[in-house]
Amino acid sequence: MSEVKLILDDCLDAMREMEADSVDAIITDLPYGVTNCAWDAVIPFAPMWEAVKHVLKPRGAFVTTASQPFTSALVMSNLQWFRYEWVWEKSKGTGFLDANRRPLKAHENVVVFSDAATDYNPQMEKGTRHHRGQRAQSKPTTVYGKFTHSLEYSDERFPKSVMRFAVQERAEHPTQKPVALYAYLIRTYTNVGATVLDFTMGSGTTGVACVKTGRNFIGIELDEGYFDIATKRIAEARMQLPLLEVT
């Protein structure tokens, strides 16, 4: 069973007290600063990165959802660590009050940082099946030269940078993300038994996804109300473990 540790505290203070190089990945949902709510206040970048570098193992991934203009500000705060982004395409758009002036927004960013190449377990997708035995050979290019390795096609496809997950219908936090999205990210950037940190835990979605995928979890949350919600959700997920397939 996954080990779970939940901390009610300021995330920067709590992370400074943690052991150095103690987590395999940080997978979180940082506040974007798009509202005046206390829970949406942007964490100062300089002390945040200092804390991240303290707790994250070398080559560990720091993955967070984001949205413009916060995405650009976050990337520029540590361009050296920035690797790439995904786009999460939502099942529903937002911004109906401005629908006559701009398109409905139906996506968010998922931004990946690391000090070096990270663990990456591509979650293969099913595509159109090619005839077995069909092979391809590329033409010479000015960049790589002639590629002579023969490829045998199958129905497995590597993931593309656009992910499609339905939005959370019954949410206990205003920005609660779907468990399926975070389980996907956890499987992609960690292996079974790894330790994942979410230092802006909110209602505990990352923790629930860790329990379902067989990862250890450390969650930090400042708001006592959301901390209690997260504690309950993660406990319920652990009770369902005999019914879950850990991957």
What are these regions (language model features)?
Residues 162, 242-247:
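Short acidic, low-complexity intrinsically disordered linear motifs used
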Residues 1-219, 224-229:
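Core catalytic lobe of class I
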Residues 1, 231-244:
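Short, conserved SAM-binding/catalytic segment
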